């Protein structure tokens, strides 16, 4: 396992512990969810989804990392910000609406004893583009379970 992937795992487990210890609902999303299921690759950033009403709380929680200003995409009902831990970009996303709508297909993954919440691999497959390089690896993993 290369150093970058080791660093990404360390950060994901560290963040999972922080959120679990502080009762903050979350899930790793997009390709980060695929990574959390054990399909390792060099990610561009780490994507995490939180309840919409927790944006200020979560941002304040990571003040020491100097998070960006809160941005928004109105037509998507999305707020977001990012920060860096050990040169890894952490992208925090907050969608309008009840969090339950966004956590329906969250699954618990255990990595080295640490609970991590991530979108299911089947959820990722439903929304993946045809040429997504992760799709064959996901099918292979699902077929071995």
For the regions a language model picked out, list residue spans one by one.
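Active-site nucleotide-donor binding segment shared across nucleotidyl transfer reactions
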Residues: 15-46, 51-52, 57
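Conserved catalytic core of two-metal-ion nucleotidyltransferases
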Residues: 67-100
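Catalytic cores of NTP-dependent nucleotidyl/adenyl transfer enzymes across multiple folds
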Residues: 100-145
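Short amphipathic alpha-helices in soluble, non-transmembrane regions
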Residues: 58-65
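Residue-level marker for the onset of beta-strands and adjacent loop->beta junctions
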Residues: 22, 77-79, 105
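Vicinal oxygen chelate
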Residues: 57-58, 70, 120
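Helical scaffold of the NTase/Pol beta-like nucleotidyltransferase catalytic core
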Residues: 1-28, 139-143
């Amino acid at each position: 396992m290369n150093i970058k992937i080791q660093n990404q795992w360390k950060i994901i487990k560290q963040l999972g512990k922080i959120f679990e210890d502080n009762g903050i609902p979350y899930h790793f999303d997009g390709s980060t969810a695929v990574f959390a299921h054990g399909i390792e690759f060099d990610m561009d950033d780490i994507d995490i989804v939180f309840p919409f009403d927790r944006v200020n709380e979560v941002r304040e929680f990571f003040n020491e990392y100097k998070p960006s200003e809160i941005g928004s995409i109105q037509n998507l009902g999305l707020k977001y910000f990012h920060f860096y831990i050990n040169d890894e970009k952490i992208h925090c996303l907050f969608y309008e609406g009840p969090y339950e709508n966004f956590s329906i297909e969250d699954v618990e993954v255990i990595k080295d004893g640490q609970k991590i919440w991530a979108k299911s691999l089947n959820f990722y497959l439903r929304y993946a583009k045809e040429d997504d390089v992760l799709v064959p690896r996901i099918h292979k993993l699902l077929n071995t379970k």
